[in-house]
Amino acid sequence: MMTLRHLPFILLLILSGELYAEEKQCDFPTVENGRIAQYYYTFKSFYFPMSVDKKLSFFCLAGYATESGKQEEQIRCTAEGWSPNPRCYKKCLKPDLRNGYVSNDKVLYKLQERMSYGCSSGYKTTGGKDEEVVHCLSAGWSSQPSCRKEQETCLAPELEHGNYSTTQRTFKVKDIVAYTCTAGYYTTTGKQTGEAECQANGWSLTPQCNKLMCSSLRLIENGYFHPVKQTYEEGDVVQFFCHENYYLSGSDLIQCYNFGWYPESPICEGRRNRCPPPPVPLNSKIQPHSTTYRHGERVHIECELNFVIQGSEELLCENGKWTEPPKCIEEKEKVACEQPPSVENGVAHPHSEIYYSGDKVTYRCGGGYSLRGSSTITCNRGRWTLPPECVENIENCKPPPDIANGVVVDGLLASYTTGSSVEYRCNEYYLLKGSETSRCEQGAWSSPPVCLEPCTIDVDHMNRNNIQLKWKYEGKILHGDLIDFVCKQGYNLSPSIPLSEISAQCNRGDVRYPMCIRKESKGMCASPPVIRNGDIVSSAARTYENGSSVEYRCFDNHFLQGSQNVYCVDGVWTTPPSCLEPCTLSFVEMDKNYLQLKWNFDNRPLILHGEYIEFMCKRDAYISETSIAGSVLRVQCDRGRLKYPKCTPRDRRLSFQEALRTRRQMEKR
């Protein structure tokens, strides 16, 4: 029975628990341009959050130092977080200054420190002065100190593939010279023209004209291209080909322009992604016409005059086959049309009291007007086809229409007359549909193209549908591209169709993800395999259903190699992981090899498999290997074994006392 005398002890426990909880203030620190000891990363959940007043060391990467200029420094956990903020800055070293001098003898400069330097007679600083002050910033010196020969004049360099605006070749300081590159060549900023200023230390930039290059092309799946180069010059054309049983989707020819490759590289699709020409019923026509038809595309069937459709007006391309086509059956009775529609500023010929299917009329416009559309319309089963318009003759068009996710790349003018045209290009990853060119005709532009949106993979949607990617996709997926999935282990497309590979098509930014369901049980598994230095997280059962899994864990300080989960597949377990032993630091081996630890934080009883530890030779010893000393003294733990490097003691002369001691020993003998 609890009494009042137990109350202080209980309160103490509660308060100390609250205080302990409040002390855990500091999360895992991120060290810019540096790191902390490896075991903190490995046992992150054990050490963090860290209690107030706890300390740890961090060290900087090569070429960086702490704010105080040290290679290693300690930080302390406070109620406000880590103090000081762990950060490493790029070291600012005293420059090796030719034809100049530095105002002090310091070798290393801390952050925000200033350094003053000057140049010898006849030389100027990078800013064109006799003396200059630079600051040590986090990325190095504010400007790299150097001394350049002072010049009263500048000589224009030889300009290949370009011309200067003047025949003059010698220029005074502050003179500016303009130059133009020949066709196909550009300045360093990618322009056709450029300027350079003559300064006391030479030209502000060296005039030059270079040929623009396009990047190398990535290989296409199930295809190849020719020619293959590391870089391509402007104007180069590359042709693409597909392997047997695959077809090109896109242009087979692409060209290197000053803005890059255009059009985009095609892809090679398999037979199942394409359909043959659609079956056209007798007495009909199809829209739209195309040279290729891809999975998911549709065509419209329209019967000829005096024929009616029986069945669906649309055909769908599905996995290389067309849906069932309709039939066009002849009408038994003629159907009359009303009088042709009237067109403003136009007349129709010939005139009749009654019109039947198949009858045609033609429109003509009055003076000062032109036809827009087909001049002839037809009576078709009681309805007239679309009549034309008579529009006023206007030569100029407004600026070309903008398109979503695309731009005009060629043909921009101050004004546009009939016959003018512009060329469109879609943004990266967007697929151009329609004609890339739009023309000005009688004051109106022909229809511009449409840029079809790409798709991005939705991982959450995939997880809900029990699927994963078959291949790794980089960046976006173009409209029309197929994405290959596989069912996750233990799942199938459906019980009746045991397919493991499934595909979906990108359609204007949308992907219809397939769904997999759990497989039917085909076999039970016995207890999961036993592993050395580890066990399973949950208690083992005698039997497991097909598709079930168990999770392994390693004993403390052991490194898990492989998948921590194994699965029961048709009565057999997948391969279990291995638990790799840690290494134990031996000070006996260190003394034998004249070694000591380079870093204090490496003084720990265990080093995990894969972790590195750095040694250094003791005083009056040197590394005996012929390799680079730094790499030899950095050792990795490999399955419980450390290969200690060997340092050799230096030869040294005997001291007076040692010589006297040696002499006495010799005399005793």
Swiss-Prot record:
Signal sequence region: 1-21
The keyword Glycoprotein is assigned to this record: yes
Glycosylation site list: N163, N546
Swiss-Prot/TrEMBL GO biological process terms: blood coagulation; blood coagulation, fibrin clot formation
Keywords, comma-separated and alphabetical: Blood coagulation, Disulfide bond, Glycoprotein, Hemostasis, Repeat, Secreted, Signal, Sushi
SMART domains attached to this UniProt entry: CCP (SM00032)
Domain Sushi as annotated: residue spans: 25-89, 90-149, 152-211, 212-270, 273-330, 335-392, 395-453, 454-517, 523-581, 582-648
Classification via PROSITE patterns: SUSHI
Protein name (record): Coagulation factor XIII B chain
Source organism phylogeny: Eukaryota, Metazoa, Chordata, Craniata, Vertebrata
Protein encoded by which gene: F13b
